[in-house]
Amino acid sequence: MGKNLTIVMLVFVSMAGWMFGADTGSIGGITNMRDFQSRFADRYNPVTDSYSYSSARQGLITGMVNVGSFFGCFLSSPLMDRIGKRTSIMFWTIVYLIGIILQVTAVPSWVQIMVAKIWTGLSIGALSVLAPGFQSEVAPADLRGTIVTTYQLAVTGGIFIAACINMGTHKLHKTAQWRVSMGINLLWGIITFIGISFLPESPRYLISVGRDEEALQIMAKNNDLPIEHEVIQTEYHVIKSDCEAELAGGPATWPEIFGPDIRYRTFLGLGVMSLQQLTGDNYYFYYGFEVFEGTGMNSPYLSALILDAVNFGCTFGGLFVLEFFGRRMPLIIGALWQSITFFIYAAVGNRALTRKNGTSNHRAGAVMIVFSCLFIFSFAQTWGPAAYVIVGESYPIRYRSKCAAVATTGNWLWGFLISFFTPFITNSIGFKYGYIFAACNLCAACIIFLFAHETKGLTLEEINELYISGAKPWMPRPKNLGNFTKQQEEVREKSRGVQGESAAHLENVDGEEGIEDSSNDISSTTSSDGRAKPESSYHDQEEQFA
């Protein structure tokens, strides 16, 4: 039962990312379809019989989904605290379906497209907080990175399939060109809604609202063990103790997430999600058609499809990279790699792409596409998935929904700014734009080195202890962390030979001792008010980051 639940979670929770990717991947091609342009573009050239957009209109049509997503992040927090993540995902999926219907039924007014994009963005923003958070809470510590990475894998899968659909529909007649491409997104929303309806709620959420019996049943099913087993009981008591300590002060308020107890991680998450956009990935995904058309390629649709295929294929590597190499080093090395690729891309585009006679140098264009793919090769395995992993696992349960919402707004805010202003910037400085992204990637590498801890293999409770400890991110992890994880692994090894037996035949004496020992460990690291004792003050570290 446990393996089946994990597979279902991977498929259906990650479908929220697929919905986002499908919208992102389709809009670049749709805005260049003849029928769509004839209805929504604001410029017409009778000599060439062609349509085009002003920079402002193109930026608004492409970027307003990010504005909706920005507000969707904030709206997700109070709802998930009240009804849980699972039900919230179902609610926002319905909002997404309504948004797609508004897009497909648009009349010849670009304003309806813009409003529909904002509405759709509300759901995409909320789901970008809910889905990785749900996966982080349900997944076992040793698989959490892989499971959360499937969200980004689904995003890239949605982008790739949307590019394939655009490739097949752009030669259709009239509104079918773009309405089929938009309308197919209804299918992804329906699949997500049906799949999520069969999933259990997060055990941590259930424990936090006093539904302990339900939480125990779900934890037992997830691990293929009876409720009485020492692994389940040990994990339950640790989560229960952690929830009681964190919730002792009542629900967190918005000002509290910027207070001394948590602001370091609030700004870290905000920074990581902002930098994910500032790496420059959506420069290719939103405007890939225009980018490759500018290199002189005969079929920009095909060129964009190749880039999306590289993105999707390389994200599979991220499933293993983050578990084998952790979070810090892939992010640092990835940012440095991406900086180099953008620098070369910009240099070739600026100096070699256009000949003196005004024609395109196709060899230079090919080099630019190669380095675009090399950028995606890195991003898809590092910054694409790792940013969601860090945000999903960094916050205590009392602050988690609000901190994750604030962090994710950074992604959507910069997504809008990049998508809206890119037409203006490229019209002004052309491919020199790449130098800006090269510099941003260098900054990203420095920020990760200075402020992000390595959290590979730790439970969510241990990650909280790590940040409280005051340890420097670039120093070795404190030795007193990881005891609970090691204890779990030892118990799991012993339990493999008895998983198929009846619970009546299990010996729980050692389990009770394990629980008592775990409780003692917890009490030794908590103060009289139930909060964790820091080994040293970390306020100085927070002030440095803030």
Curated annotation (Swiss-Prot):
Any one annotated GO CC term = plasma membrane
**Coiled-coil segments:** none
Report if keyword Membrane is assigned: yes
Record bears the keyword Ubl conjugation: no
GO function terms (MF aspect) = carbohydrate:proton symporter activity; high-affinity D-glucose transmembrane transporter activity
Q: Which family does it belong to?
A: Belongs to the major facilitator superfamily. Sugar transporter (TC 2.A.1.1) family.
Protein name from the UniProt record = High-affinity glucose transporter ght5
Quote the subcellular location field of this record. Answer: Membrane
Species, as recorded: Schizosaccharomyces pombe (strain 972 / ATCC 24843)
Comp. bias (Low complexity): 520-529
Location of Phosphoserine modifications:
S528, S537
**Its gene?**
ght5
Describe its membrane topology: Multi-pass membrane protein
